[in-house]
Structures are given as C-alpha cells and as structure tokens.
C-alpha cells in the first residue's frame, strides 16, 4: 500500500506527510480536495449541464436550470419511480404468495401429524374391576404429549451452518424498500414540481451581441434596474412576477420599500423574491463551500 520503504530518505518513522500522500495515491479513506475557480460554475449556468442557460428557469430555492434539462430530469425521475414501484409491488406479491404457501404447508403438516397420532391409538376393552391408574406402561419410554404442539427447544437453538445440508441458510433476494413517489430537486433534495419553476429573464449588457458572442464574454448580464454588471461576486435575486434578475443591494434599498415589481408593477411578497444560488468566486470568503469530499473504503489493520 505504501512506499515508505522505497523512498531514498526513508526513516524509522512513518510521517504524516507520507501517510497523506500514500492515502491519496492508494484511493483508500476519505479523499479531500480544495476546489479552485475552474471547478466553480458561473451564476447563469445550469446546475445539471453546467452550461450557460438559453431558456433558464429557477426553483423556489434559487437553483438555476435549463428548462429542457430539468424537464427531462423530472420525466426521467417519474419513469424511475414507476419502475421501482412496479418492482416493489411484484416482490410484495411474491412474498404474500410465499407466506400463503408456508401457511398451507404448515396446516397440512398439522393435519398429517394429527392423523398419524390417531392411527397409532390402539383401542382396548375397559375392565371395570381395574382402577383407572393401572394402565399399561409406555413401551417406548416416552412421555405422552399433545398431537400438535410447538417445536422442541433443541430445534429452536439450531444455528445455520454452511457445511451441513440440512442447516444451510437460504439465499433470499434483497428486500426492496417502498419507494417515494415524490420527485426531488437534484441540488436541494426538496420536492419539485413543474409548476414550481419560474422563468428567468436576464438583461443583456449589450443587446446587439448574439448568443454565441455573449457566451465568450466574462460579463454578460446586468441588473434590470440599476444596470450593474452581474457576476459570481454579486448576490442576485429573481423577481417571480416578471422573472427579472436584480442585485440584492437593489432589493434591499429600492424594492423592499414599496414591494412592487419595478418591471411590470405587480405587488411583491417575500415568496416572490428568490435569492439566486451563485457559483462563488473561488475564494473562501465568497460564502460557497469549496471543499469536496468523497468517501472510499478504509483499510484497517
């Protein structure tokens, strides 16, 4: 696993640096990496395709998606849920049939045992001059017991064994849990419906630039009210009635005073102001988690 003995400066102590390096090289244990700016998506990119959105929509939690991508995801989840429900119902029906078969077999065993006990009884004429306690001794030395009763204690303590054919455990199929019928958001994990999606309209910095030329620019969109440039360093919000994207500074200083959408004049509520989840700038102070972890098997002595 390690290369401690192969290093030219190998010492008697396995250092912490060597342990971390060998852990990263071997793939065992939890792997950690600090994400750089190249690994952070832009604020106007889809959370599924990681590409700039052509027809963007936003969820109530502020996650931006391409309409085609999120609708395809929802349809895929519904088909997957239908498949899981079908498999669950099939296994459930098979288990019911198995339980019924076991109950029928147990009932047949009880009837068979009762008939065998009844057939073994020998009728003898009663002698009125002999007391009832004077009966014939049991030739087999067994105590009389009920014809149908619980299994003996020695049978209860029988453990499964792989080398005795009669005690070999049965290989059973994995029990399926009842699947949830709710489609969830791929980012937040909360329930998501098509009616919860809100269309987003970004205001372009230059209306004369086509879509291809717009993608190549670092600053593509501006605030719909203040015309400030939007980026990962600028907290943004989406107004639900109009779908316009504005800065949070504009929301706090201008929009919250009257709670009126400055684009179409509709009345706003707190639910209509959706804070957009931005990708971050790559700096630790941007408020975005930049530490990625992946759990791997652990090698223990």
UniProtKB/Swiss-Prot annotation:
Subunit field text: Interacts with NOS1 and NOS3. Interacts with PP2A holoenzyme, containing PPP2CA, PPP2CB, PPP2R1A and PPP2R2A subunits.
Keyword list, A-Z: Cytoplasm, Developmental protein, Nucleus, Phosphoprotein, Transferase, Ubl conjugation pathway
Free-text disruption phenotype from the record: Although mutant embryos are present at the expected Mendelian rate at 18.5 dpc, they die shortly after birth with signs of respiratory distress and cyanosis, likely due to craniofacial malformations. Malformations in knockout mice range from ocular hypotelorism, narrow snout, laterally cleft lip, and cleft secondary palate to cyclopia and presence of proboscis or a single head-like protrusion devoid of facial features. In addition, the weight of knockout embryos is significantly reduced.
Pathway of action: Protein modification; protein ubiquitination
Gene transcribed to yield this protein: Nosip
Gene Ontology CC annotations of this record: cytoplasm; nucleoplasm
Pfam families: zf-NOSIP
Protein name: Nitric oxide synthase-interacting protein
Coiled-coil residue spans: none
Enzyme class: transferase
Family: Belongs to the NOSIP family.
GO function terms (MF aspect): molecular sequestering activity; ubiquitin protein ligase activity
Extent of motif Nuclear localization signal: 78-101
Region of interest: U-box-like: 55-75
Cellular compartment(s): Cytoplasm; Nucleus
Chain positions with Phosphoserine modification: 36
Highest taxon in the source lineage: Eukaryota
Higher taxonomy: Eukaryota, Metazoa, Chordata, Craniata, Vertebrata
UniProt comment concerning the protein's domains: The U-box-like region is a truncated U-box domain. It is unknown whether it is functional or not.
Catalysis performed (reactions): S-ubiquitinyl-[E2 ubiquitin-conjugating enzyme]-L-cysteine + [acceptor protein]-L-lysine = [E2 ubiquitin-conjugating enzyme]-L-cysteine + N(6)-ubiquitinyl-[acceptor protein]-L-lysine
């Amino acid at each position: 696993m390690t290369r401690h003995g192969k290093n030219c400066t190998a010492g008697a102590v396995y250092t912490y640096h060597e342990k971390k390096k060998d852990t990263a090289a071997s793939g065992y244990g939890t792997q950690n990496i600090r994400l750089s700016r190249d690994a952070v998506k832009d604020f106007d990119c889809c959370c599924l395709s990681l590409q700039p959105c052509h027809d963007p929509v936003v969820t109530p939690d502020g996650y931006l998606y391409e309409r085609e991508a999120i609708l395809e995801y929802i349809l895929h989840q519904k088909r997957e849920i239908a498949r899981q429900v079908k498999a669950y119902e099939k296994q459930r029906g098979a288990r019911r049939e198995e339980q019924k078969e076991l109950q029928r077999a147990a009932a047949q065993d009880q009837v068979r045992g009762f008939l065998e006990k009844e057939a073994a009884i020998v009728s003898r004429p009663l002698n009125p001059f002999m007391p009832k306690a004077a009966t014939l001794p049991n030739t087999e030395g067994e105590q009389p017991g009920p014809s149908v009763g619980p299994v003996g204690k020695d049978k209860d303590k029988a453990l499964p064994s792989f080398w005795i054919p009669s005690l070999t455990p049965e290989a059973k199929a994995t029990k399926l849990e009842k699947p949830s019928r709710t489609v969830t958001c791929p980012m937040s994990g909360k329930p998501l419906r098509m009616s919860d999606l809100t269309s987003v309209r970004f205001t372009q910095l230059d209306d004369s630039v086509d879509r291809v030329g717009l993608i190549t620019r670092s600053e593509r969109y501006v605030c719909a009210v203040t015309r400030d440039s939007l980026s990962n360093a600028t907290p943004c919000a989406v107004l639900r009635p109009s779908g316009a994207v504005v800065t949070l500074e504009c929301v706090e200083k201008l929009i919250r005073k009257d709670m009126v959408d400055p684009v179409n004049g509709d009345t706003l509520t707190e639910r209509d102001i959706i804070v957009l989840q931005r990708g971050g700038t790559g700096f630790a102070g941007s408020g975005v988690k930049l530490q990625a972890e992946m759990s791997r098997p652990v090698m223990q002595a």
